[in-house]
C-alpha cells in the first residue's frame, strides 16, 4: 500500500509547535506521522520562511517567540533533515501569477496561490490546512484538516 502524501499549509506547522493552540494536538500528531515515516510530508520553501517569521514573532507566538537560534535548530532538525520533500518555487512562479490573474486574486492571496500551484505540479494526496476557506474554490485540490487525516 502506498503512503499518502500530504502538502502542508504553514498554519498546520505553526500549530504543531504552539502548545497553546487548540489545534496543537492534531497538528503535532500529523507532523509526527511524517517524522516517523508513516506518511509522506511535502512543504515549500515558502513554508520554511513563513514558519521562521511566525515562530520568531512575539505577537504571533503570544509573547513567547523562539529565538532565531532556536528556530534555526528546529527547522534543521525537523524540516531540513530529509523527512520532508521540499519543493522550490522556480517551476511554479509563472503558474502562480497566471492563476492569480485568472481568478482575479490579489494581495496576500498570492501566497496561497503559490502553494496551490505547487500542489498542481506535485499532486499530493491531500493539502492539509485549517484555513480551508482560503482554498475551497481552487480545482484539483483535496483539502483536509489534520483532524480528518488522523
What are these regions (language model features)?
Residues 1-5, 113-150:
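Acidic, PIN/NYN-like endoribonuclease modules and their adjacent C-terminal/linker elements
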Residues 10, 45, 109-113:
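Conserved glycosyltransferase catalytic-site signature
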Residues 54-86:
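Helix-adjacent hinge/juxtasegments
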Residues 83-130:
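Active-site neighborhoods of divalent-metal-dependent phosphate/nucleic-acid chemistry enzymes
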Amino acid at each position: 500500500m502506498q503512503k499518502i502524501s500530504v502538502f502542508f499549509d504553514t498554519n498546520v506547522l505553526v500549530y504543531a509547535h504552539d502548545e497553546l493552540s487548540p489545534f496543537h494536538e492534531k497538528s503535532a500528531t500529523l507532523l509526527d506521522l511524517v517524522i516517523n515515516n508513516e506518511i509522506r510530508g511535502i512543504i515549500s520553501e515558502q513554508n520554511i520562511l513563513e514558519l521562521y517569521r511566525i515562530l520568531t514573532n512575539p505577537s504571533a507566538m503570544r509573547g513567547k517567540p523562539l529565538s532565531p537560534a532556536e528556530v534555526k535548530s528546529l527547522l534543521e532538525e525537523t524540516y531540513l533533515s530529509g523527512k520532508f520533500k521540499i519543493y522550490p518555487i522556480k517551476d511554479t512562479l509563472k503558474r502562480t501569477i497566471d492563476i492569480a490573474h485568472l481568478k482575479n486574486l490579489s494581495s496576500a492571496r498570492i501566497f496561497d496561490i503559490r502553494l496551490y500551484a505547487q500542489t498542481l505540479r506535485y499532486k499530493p494526496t491531500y493539502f492539509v490546512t485549517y484555513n480551508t476557506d482560503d482554498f475551497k474554490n481552487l480545482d484539483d485540490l483535496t483539502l483536509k484538516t489534520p483532524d480528518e487525516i488522523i
